[in-house]
Amino acid sequence: RISDIAALHPDLVILSFGTNESHNRRYNTLLHYRQMDELVRMLRDSLPNVPLLMTTPPGSYDSFRKSRRRRTYSINPRTAIAVETMRRFADDNGLAVWDMYEAVGGRQRACLNWQEAKLMRPDHVHYLPEGYVLQGELFYQALLKAYNDYVGY
């Protein structure tokens, strides 16, 4: 609930989503945009002076049943569409955005880099703990760099 977030008196709210939305085979960009808009409006109403930062999802795979016992995996093509929708929303609404999808390889390598480094769970969507640690470190480094660029370091 938004009231629970407001009760924390945050200095920054980070909105990180897109993976689950893009895993819906009926992913709808208009619906996703509207949902983000509704959430951001509620946050801004409750926390008018708190900056909001969005992060895009990393790459992930779609799973298909190849036979009764075997599944095959391919890169989820809707992730790139969700990222594009999120970037457009952030731009339209004056939100900062960290594009994790591009930071970890974009359309060509985002999934493959994590899979080859053995940082993904067998579901090919979620990370192992080490993967989440790396995600946090990448975000921290990007945030620190943006701050240093801002203050002129």
Indicate residue ranges for each PLM-predicted region:
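Alpha-helix N-cap/loop-to-helix boundary motif
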Residues: 28-35, 74, 78
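Short, functional N-terminal and low-complexity linear motifs
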Residues: 2-10, 49-52, 101-107
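Structural recognition of the beta-strand scaffold that forms the well-ordered cores
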Residues: 12-16, 51-56, 96-100, 126
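Oxyanion-hole/transition-state-stabilizing segment in secreted/luminal serine hydrolases
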Residues: 1-33, 59-60
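Catalytic His-Asp segment of secreted/periplasmic serine-dependent ester chemistry enzymes
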Residues: 60-153
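Alpha-helical scaffolding within the catalytic cores
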Residues: 1-6, 34-42, 83, 109
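Extended hydrophobic-aromatic, low-complexity segments
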Residues: 24-25, 51-55, 63-66, 108-109
